[in-house]
Amino acid sequence: MSGAADGTVPVGEDTHQEDSGERECEQRPVHSGREATGESDPALERPDHGERHGPEPRFPSFSVRPEAAQPPPSRTIARESFLGRFITDCLKWKNDVVKIDPNICKDPFPSDDEIFGNIGSHSTLLRELHECAYRYQKAVNASHPLLQRDGSLKTLNYGVQPFIVTVYGPTGSGKSQFLRNVISSKMIDPPPETVFFVTPEKGTVTNEEKLSWEAQCAEGVYNSKCVPITKTFQPAFVNLSFSEAVDEENLSIDSPNNVFVQAAKKGPICIIIDECMNQLGACRSISSFFHALPSKIFGRFPACTGYTVLVVLHNMNPRSDRGNIKDLKIQSKCHIISPQLESQQVSRFIKNFSFGFPTPLVSVIKDIVDHAKMHSKFSWLVYCSVPVRESFRWSYYSPEDQLTPLYVDLQAVMYEACHNIRRVFCKRLYSRVSYANKRKWYD
């Protein structure tokens, strides 16, 4: 009591107060951050000086307006779309050509439903098919304005001059009638006003044949409304022997007696050499008749807007030749072949001139020739080395359908598209089979 009255604290009490202070410090938690505080812990806030502040707003981690779920990317292609129509045409073409040669599109080949249902998942294949479809449509748009209403070609040359044509066909294949049809059907542009008919001998043309030539030559200078399309009402028909045609006077453009120069001063001319294969193979070199003379006459006389040479051969590979027939083939811008010719010669020609399109398509052209040989005796396969459009390089002539293009370039595009489809889907099928085999092995 005396200690308390004196104002001093007893030793025991002092020790108790110190121990309680230490325990209070030990029980007080140490906060390392805002996240470490609990609900029962005092808030780590600034001292309140009488101003009341609301709690700090906290934004939710999720979006207030959640985005709508996006549908998965579509793998299908509409058949009515531009690419869908192209794929449909390719598959239809594939079903037709495999009947000719199954090696063109080998099995296994995916079905139509599988192609249209899963093609959207192959971006590289879609890009390749779009490129093929673009090239296909571009070629179609370029060729369509140059065709007639029935889809046939208007002419053989489409204004290409000078124009040298070689016709191959055995005896009895209708070569003479075909040449007359070429003149009368205006298949040479422009129509000739003078026609030179060269034979081995001058008197070998009978009066009946001469009248037929004159009548069909006159038919070729009038349109369907009987309106003349040239400066003459009756084209001149001149019969020459082979020796006269290749005479030195007629091979020199400066000779005043050159019959070809005299006719070129009046208008377009056409020279037809028929039944002269033996003379071409046995005579001296007359290569200038096929390359120097046509270009010089066509370039010197403005009235001669057309210079056409039609040469008839019975055989593609004659036994004797001094270089004239070889030069003729080199200078020829158009080769017309009868299906009645020997099959080996036709096949060799197609293989030699099939550059630019896939080799499997050779069987398609051969099938056309074989079909024509069996069903159409007076039909012809036409190859043009300088076409105005690539689609017109190969064509087919028949008296019923006239001159129809084969569109080999478009078939090459379809072949490329089918090849790409098969490559991608067969690889996918192989992956599926390989995966299934591995699962069986592990199981």
Curated annotation (Swiss-Prot):
GO process annotations (BP): DNA-templated transcription; nuclear capsid assembly; regulation of DNA-templated transcription; viral DNA genome packaging via site-specific sequence recognition; viral release from host cell; viral transcription
Induction: Expressed in the intermediate phase of the viral replicative cycle.
InterPro entries assigned: Adeno_IVa2, P-loop_NTPase
Name of one Pfam family that matches: Adeno_IVa2
Region span, DNA-binding: 433-443
Protein name: Packaging protein 1
Positions annotated to bind ATP: G169, P170, T171, G172, S173, G174, K175, S176
Subcellular location: Virion; Host nucleus, Host nucleoplasm; Host nucleus, Host nucleolus
Keywords on record: Activator, ATP-binding, DNA-binding, Host nucleus, Nucleotide-binding, Phosphoprotein, Transcription, Transcription regulation, Viral genome packaging, Viral release from host cell, Virion
Disordered as annotated region, ranges: 1-75
Biased composition (Basic and acidic residues): 13-56
Species of provenance: Snake adenovirus serotype 1
Family named by the database record: Belongs to the adenoviridae packaging protein 1 family.
Recorded superkingdom: Viruses
GO MF: ATP binding; DNA binding
A GO cellular component annotation in the UniProt record: host cell nucleoplasm
Function: Component of the packaging machinery which encapsidates the viral DNA into preformed capsids and transcriptional activator of the viral major late promoter (MLP). Binds, along with packaging proteins 2 and 3, to the specific packaging sequence on the left end of viral genomic DNA and displays ATPase activity thereby providing the power stroke of the packaging machinery. The activity of packaging protein IVa2 is stimulated by protein 33K which acts as a terminase. May be the protein that pumps DNA into the capsid powered by ATP hydrolysis.
Subunit structure: Homodimer. Part of a genome packaging complex composed of packaging proteins 1, 2 and 3; this complex specifically binds to the packaging sequence on the left end of viral genomic DNA and performs packaging of the viral genome. Interacts with protein 33K.
